[in-house]
Amino acid sequence: MFGKLRPIVGRLWAAPARGLLALGVHPNAVTIVGTLGVVFGACFFFPQGGTMLFWGVMFITVFVVTDMLDGTMARLSGKSSRLGAYLDSTLDRVADAAIFGALVWTFRVEEPATAMAALLCLAIGSFVPYARARAEGLGIDAKGGIAERSDRLFLGLLATGLVGLGLPLWILTGTLYILAVLAAITVGQRTMAVVRANREDFATPAESTSGDA
């Protein structure tokens, strides 16, 4: 859902992206700094609980937006590269691990149901990009799905921030379980894209022989 907004957001980021490029900042540097900011914000703020959950979300959000800024910078500068794509994808996984891992740590003792929900989001969510990468390695387009990373990240941070403002914890717990289910569905959708692209693998020997004839 939110992935479809990338072209619009990219245009909004054009001005600051040009400014950073004028200062000689490399897109890969923005990617790395953004990830470090997310990791610090999640690991420092979330374990303190309470209102620090909200402030952690605010801090993290500032750095999450760099995920779009670095891409805009790369396109404007013509510095798009395989290294940049690799860093962007790999460091996204690091950021996700920090966010959901910090939530697991925060609630592991007093709220095990919430901790388990965060753990499921982390575990199942890691399969989503793998399913796409493996499909693309086979030459198959398996983008999209009911809940891409940006969707899960937005909803997870939103629920965390609301709990930090004093709303009931079940809002976060329920949201995380729903996100885990949506991530599983997304993996299934991408798997089906591969299945549809390789229907011949499911043909019986008799069907294959008659087809060749």
Locate each region found by the language model.
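Hydrophobic, well-structured mid-protein blocks that either form specific transmembrane helices
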Residues: 59-111
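Hydrophobic alpha-helical transmembrane segments
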Residues: 1-61, 98-213
